[in-house]
Amino acid sequence: MKKHPASTLLCAASLLVTSAVTFAGTDTAKKEITLAPEEDIVVHPVTSPYYAEDSFVTTDIRPVFVYHNIPGNVLGGGNASVTAVQVRIKITDSLQFVAYKDGWLDISTPSLGNRGWNDIAAGIKWAFYRNDAAHFQAAAGLGYEFASGDRTVLQHDDSLRAWLSANKGFGKLHVGATFNYSWAMGNGTPLLGTSDWLSWHLHTDYQVCKYFSPLIEVNGYHTTRGSAVPFSAADVASISNNGSPTVSGAVGMEIRPFKSLALRAAFEFPLTHDRDIYGNRITVSSVVKF
């Protein structure tokens, strides 16, 4: 029987993360080659930059550019782009300040053609578990998105977000998962409504050499409460959803020309067929470490 490639990719990514959790307590490090501290050799999540948060506590700046091709059945088609800068500051070995959402949003469609500011969101991450021998880390976080952005670009929606993440290393192979839940607080006035939602994000990368790692990521978004607008902007804008999940897959890479600099890019595409804003997406970002 012919398998759907989207289902195969999703199952493979899920299997990798399930294996990471299952074997976190085993002695997997006996024959591994430890090249550097785990946070120095893994690739931080590239796609869904607002919500795919790993378990590592670092200090870095991450410029991000995202370009979307919007399908014709959403807002008449067109494109949207986001330009932003994320900041992460290590407070202690287990606490990190995360400024994960800001920037400038440009939406160009026949139905909506506007430019404006994103909402601003920030939070605290707590790395509550770390086992260096097993190459396993886990963290939790709490963040708040302030209704500071422009309604004309589908922002101005305040929300409370909680997340949980886990990461596991198998030598040069690294896998990770993040789970989020977001509650709309009702203090903003977004143009197309608000919603409560949960999301999950799977990541795997392989260190080919100290300069290069390919990666695969899968992102899923599920609305749990919201008005019945028949499409979802996932992590792009404040648009409600009628309950249909949005799942995307991505392939990409990271290049590390210097120890303190990583350059990344990924191409993202839908794995579900609901009417969402994922025609396809290109994410380009860098990580400047301090």
Where are these regions (language model features)?
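Transmembrane beta-barrel domains of Gram-negative outer membranes and organellar outer membranes
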Residues: 24-290
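Cleavable N-terminal export/targeting peptides
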Residues: 1-38
